[in-house]
């Protein structure tokens, strides 16, 4: 049974590979934030009276910046620890969330799109790289299965938060700014995972 296998793997991670578990919590939070921001950039553009053509242009701009950002972080990964670069990317997204509060024109929207692009592809690639380094090689298949489930579920929880804020009367800018919480807590859990030293019995 697929669900039994999934829950069995999650239980194994929670009891035997807590470093992996801490990272997965961090990953779930910050990648959910990434997905939510990307999904709602269009809504912010609409509020700023950006037409459909303009939205497509900004999306293409974001993807181009993301490609360049991935190349830059790829070079940096040869000199710095993966976790250090992950901290930079998460902090960058945290700043993007807060910047959303100041948006009032298309120039500001362009700056936000640039910020999203800078860290989007890099955060995803660095996360996968770090995960591959901390999991037991013999469990890579099933562990990456859980990782991919978390990745594909990106923006689920964040979308609920966005909807709740808007339902309470908040603007889309305020709603996006609340996603900073996801990155802040994700940063903390990544720090915990990075500093976690597994007791000997966890490796037996």
Question: What would you call each of these model-derived segments?
Answer:
Residues 177-204:
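Multi-pass alpha-helical transporter architecture, strongest
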Residues 122-135:
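Intracellular juxtamembrane helix-capping segments at the cytosolic ends
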Residues 164-183:
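A membrane-interface helix-boundary motif in multi-pass transporters
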């Amino acid at each position: 049974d697929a669900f039994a296998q999934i829950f069995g793997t999650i239980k194994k991670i929670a009891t035997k590979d807590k470093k992996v578990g801490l990272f997965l919590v961090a990953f779930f939070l910050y990648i959910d934030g990434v997905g939510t921001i990307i999904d709602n950039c269009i809504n912010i553009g609409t509020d700023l009276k950006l037409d459909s053509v303009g939205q497509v242009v900004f999306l293409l701009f974001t993807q181009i910046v993301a490609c360049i950002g991935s190349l830059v972080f790829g070079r940096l990964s040869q000199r710095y620890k993966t976790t250090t670069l992950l901290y930079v990317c998460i902090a960058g997204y945290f700043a993007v969330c807060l910047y959303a509060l100041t948006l009032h024109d298309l120039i500001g929207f362009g700056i936000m799109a640039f910020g999203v692009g800078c860290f989007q592809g890099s955060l995803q690639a660095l996360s996968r790289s770090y995960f591959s380094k901390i999991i037991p090689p013999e469990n890579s298949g099933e562990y990456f299965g859980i990782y991919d489930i978390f990745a594909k579920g990106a923006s689920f929880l964040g979308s609920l938060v966005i909807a709740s804020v808007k339902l309470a009367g908040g603007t889309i800018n305020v709603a996006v700014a609340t996603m900073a919480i996801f990155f802040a807590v994700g940063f903390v859990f990544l720090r915990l995972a990075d500093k976690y030293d597994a007791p000997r019995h966890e490796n037996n």
